[in-house]
Amino acid sequence: MRIALVQSWLGEGAGEPVFPIGLASLAASLPGHEVAAFDPNVAGPVPMAALARFLRDFAPDLTGLSLRNIDSTNTRVNVSYLPPFAATLTTVRRETAGPIAVGGAGFSMFAAALMAAYPAIDFGVALEGEAAFAALAATLASGGDPSATPSLYCRDASGAARFTGEAAKIDLSGLPSPDFSILPMAPYLAVPWGVGVETKRGCALSCVYCPYGFLNGRRYRAKAPAQVAAEINALRDVHGATRFTFLDSVFNCPSDHARAVMEAMVAAGCTLPWSAWFAERGLDRDFLELARRAGCDTVIFSPDAFGDAALKRLGKASSVAEITAAYELVRDLGCFEVSYNFFKNPPGQTLAAALAMLRFIFKARREMGKKAHFELNAIRVEPHTALARLAEEEGLIAPDADLLKPVMYTQKKTAYIEKFLDVLLRAAGK
């Protein structure tokens, strides 16, 4: 089959484009098919016209459309990606005769609602896409019945979408490396954090706001360290990448696999600088020194709160003492930039904890200067999370809310804290 893989347009002014690693992974899992990819986010000033030309020239039998996120999740300047997604879908529908399958993390989290809202979608690929999309392509090529394929949304005779049931999680040891040649790398090199590299899937942590457990499962599934190192060197030597970031939900969990990956990188001569999300608990000097030898120059933490009560309500694995100790390790080594994410008014927030967070931020900026970075955000209520259940219990959302329109959680009794922090952020020009 001729298969087109298309990244959804994010709209005008969406910022630096991110290399579509999902499409690269799909392409690598489609041997025997003629595959071409298109990203309207790097297609110039008239992206839908460029997409239409690509589709007319390639004439696909099947088109896969990736929806990575449905909005920017920023509460003060929230940008919905659904209107540009609709424009992308309309263009694909108009220019192609074959079926359209939509997948990606954004689609998977809101699959039923999106299938209902956009009847132009023929099939939905839920959760991990490599095996399900390849099976869909094979079934369509042979004239079979796609409704027998797991992890698909298929339409019945009335047009209603039916889910075929979740498939078993993919064994990453048998998954080929992403095909990074599916699109030119050059348009993505300006992204500050670089191209994404995956060492594992799954997350055993229990953060109440996070959908990663739903998307990838609670059990870690690891790639071979040597394969990860080979992918990194190929990004540098073949595709011209200048840096990368690890896509793992938390890089150093489990720490033994992360150590093995970094040791393989050192042995393979990986020289690209990189960043990753780290958990504070269990982080030690030896691990960070190995990370530096392997090329890490930026450590990213997401403690989210600075009070033990709020950390417990958020389902975080670390304590304030561990957050402080991890910061001191990074500061004392002196060879990293560090970035932090905090929520302004999470469950369990107190005035004392908010003030302690501000003291921590000012202390870190005083000690590390411009090498310390901070983001203060609201929490978007995502489906399939414990926070969604809490928001329902508190009357913030209805039991049947599809959450396509963003809802931000703020603890009612301390709502003044978020308002105060918003004033500070505006004064700082953020």
Labelled PLM ranges:
Residues 173, 178-337, 344-346:
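Radical SAM [4Fe-4S] cluster-binding motif and immediate context
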Residues 12-23:
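Glycine- and acidic-residue-enriched helix-capping/strand-helix junction motifs
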Residues 2-13, 156, 189, 337, ...:
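C-terminal accessory regions of radical SAM enzymes
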Residues 78-88, 259-260, 316-322, 356-357:
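Charged helix-capping and loop-helix junction motifs
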Residues 113-132, 293-298, 360-376, 397-403:
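Structural recognition of alpha->loop->beta junctions
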Residues 1-3, 9-11, 155-196:
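N-terminal [4Fe-4S]-dependent radical SAM core
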Residues 29-166, 384:
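Glycine-rich beta-alpha loop elements in corrinoid/cobalamin-binding modules
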Residues 111-118, 287, 348-362:
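Catalytic cores of alpha/beta
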